[in-house]
Amino acid sequence: MIDELIERMKKGDRRATARLITLVENDEEKAREIIRKIYPLTGNAYIVGITGPPGAGKSTLLDKLIKEARKEGLIVGVIAIDPTSPFTGGALLGDRIRMQRHSTDPGVFIRSMATRGSLGGLAKATNDAIKVLDAYGCDVIFVETVGVGQVEVDIVKTADTVVLVTVPGLGDDVQTIKAGLMEIADIFVINKADKEGADATYFELNLALDLESDKWRELGWRPPVVETVATMNKGIKELWDKIKEHREFLERSGRLKEKRRKRIEEEIKTIVSGIIAGKVEASIKRGEFEEIIRRVSQKDIDPYSAADMILKEIIGGGLSVQEN
């Protein structure tokens, strides 16, 4: 079945591509098989992460950015991360409905992914979905997240360019941003820039960035602050140009290759950690380490030594959690 879906995907079959994303999102074993088979086809798409607090108008902004990319004949993929209500189990799509106008365009593939409360695995599922869209043939893939928490940080770390969207009047929004995404944002956007307080937000953001001037000098890229009014299409072309400018900078400086290599390193570490944690969990559930747990309870051994013994049992030695 998977081989057939992949063959159909290679021919541009959208339904087969959607099915593959569903499988990588929900079936761990099939996800492994799919990624193994499509991996040689990946590495061509440019990934743009779009994040920021709820109500910043990210979906409207993204709707306009899709248009800019399509004007250039680019095939566009969109992965929109939806927070799922714990009460209804439904995704809160809100103004993402606007993006659906592109759904009849064969050059645009839009996919919503719900958190379903399993935040830990969401970054991995997003990463795998990106690979499917990359293999499908997307030139640019936008990943939109809601909020500015750790999960969003983990997800946008899968991007080549990170766009952080804020709006005037969010109170201590600059402080909030500094606590979360300031470190990894490549471009800042003040959307709804026709609202009162836009100038103050622009000044505050630039001031915060200027305090890090040594860092930008060393990096070679000082994140620009772009003002937009997405509903009126103002500033969209400038934002799209800045995204392309950042890509050119990354490619020219060799940082894109470096960034992607680092991402692969992190991905492998995450996968290895997940495999080991899964094996340990399964072994404990089967009662295989009752004796070790009993010895820790009786203070015969400490938890670090117990963990070391369990790891040696599971992976045959060579990996220790004890301090050097």
Swiss-Prot record:
One of its GO terms (molecular function) is GTPase activity. It is an enzyme of class 3 (hydrolase). This is Putative GTPase PYRAB02490. Its EC number is 3.6.-.-. NCBIfam families: lao. CDD domains: MMAA-like. It comes from Pyrococcus abyssi (strain GE5 / Orsay). It holds the Pfam family MeaB. The lineage of its organism: Archaea, Methanobacteriati, Methanobacteriota, Thermococci, Thermococcales.
